[in-house]
Amino acid sequence: MEGTPPGAAPSSALAAVLKHSSALPPESAQVQGYDFNRGVDYHALLDAYRTTGFQATNFGRAVQQVNAMIEKKLEPLAVDEDHHADLTQSRRPLTGCTIFLGYTSNLISSGIRETIRYLVQHNMVDVLVTTAGGVEEDLIKCLAPTYLGEFSLRGKELRESGINRIGNLLVPNDNYCKFEDWLMPILDQMVLEQNTEGVKWTPSKMISRLGKEINNPDSVYYWAHKNHIPVLSPALTDGSLGDMIFFHSYKNPGLVLDIVEDLRLINTQAIFAKRSGMIILGGGVVKHHIANANLMRNGADYAVYINTAQEFDGSDSGARPDEAVSWGKIRMDAQPVKVYADASLVFPLLVAETFAQKADAFRAEKNED
């Protein structure tokens, strides 16, 4: 190459390969994974995720974000801060951070149900949002079990056998027959109370009633009823519950569910929150319903998304938290986190590093109430 001395590498190649770096910000963390020479310490292992990189680092940041929600939630309020007439509908006292938990139905079908039940049982979250399946699958599990299967099982053969597949989970169709037998008398009673007592049913009131009627401590909604945690399900008819309501409408017509009252309930929970945090597992209606409620307060203070959806198709499910910032659904000064992962892998670990670490503090708070 012209101008290059004999025996020397081309200067342009040297300049390109050996380009000098600018200094990184002094607070930059070094990549460091867990050293198993320390033995098996799961808390230390998960703490090391913060500096591992990729989605492990996002998980570590999600732990920090949820712990920030909990820290603010457990802070005592001033005497004049917890009186808002609009919040009396849910019968829940205001805390330093109102935590919204959203999850799709498949997670209740899976063993994540037990993780969610733990949070609700111990009054660790304030508002639940799910789909019809996220309600009915919890109740059905109190009547009959769901089984492990394989993703590869053929739909035609399963249908001929009366077996429904949810990923690698199997639900015998007899479970839904048992659900119908249990639900129909409750729907009859709801219609009676509507007609004779003027009860105005909403999806959240119906779910609370079902939680009371199931009377089983394995149920998420048993504990939601006991702890006055509202459960919002704007798509409550989109599932087996809807099927049963449809069949019941022929036998005993007239049941009315008011979604507008529930809309006011969730929006006021956000509006009057001192701070708000969103933990959203999956996407679709549960993700947007919580985010849109937080628009009413110019955005959530904290947000954690866990899902595998991508943003390239413009879907709400795949949208990153920064898109919600543009809509005013997450605050501009927030530090939201999205973990690109299957929630069945990640969420129990997240709870282990956050809520479960503060179990005694939550019990103490409940005893004070």
Swiss-Prot record:
Active site per database record: K329 (nucleophile)
Domain of life: Eukaryota
Keyword set, alphabetical order: Hypusine biosynthesis, NAD, Transferase
Metabolic or biological pathway, per its Swiss-Prot or TrEMBL entry: Protein modification; eIF5A hypusination
Xref: Gene3D superfamilies: Deoxyhypusine synthase (3.40.910.10)
Presence of the UniProt keyword Transferase in the record: yes
A GO molecular function held by the record: identical protein binding
Pfam families: DS (PF01916)
Cofactor field: NAD(+)
Annotated function: Catalyzes the NAD-dependent oxidative cleavage of spermidine and the subsequent transfer of the butylamine moiety of spermidine to the epsilon-amino group of a critical lysine residue of the eIF-5A precursor protein to form the intermediate deoxyhypusine residue. This is the first step of the post-translational modification of that lysine into an unusual amino acid residue named hypusine. Hypusination is unique to mature eIF-5A factor and is essential for its function.
Family to which the UniProt record says this protein belongs: Belongs to the deoxyhypusine synthase family.
Protein name: Deoxyhypusine synthase
Organism: Mus musculus (Mouse)
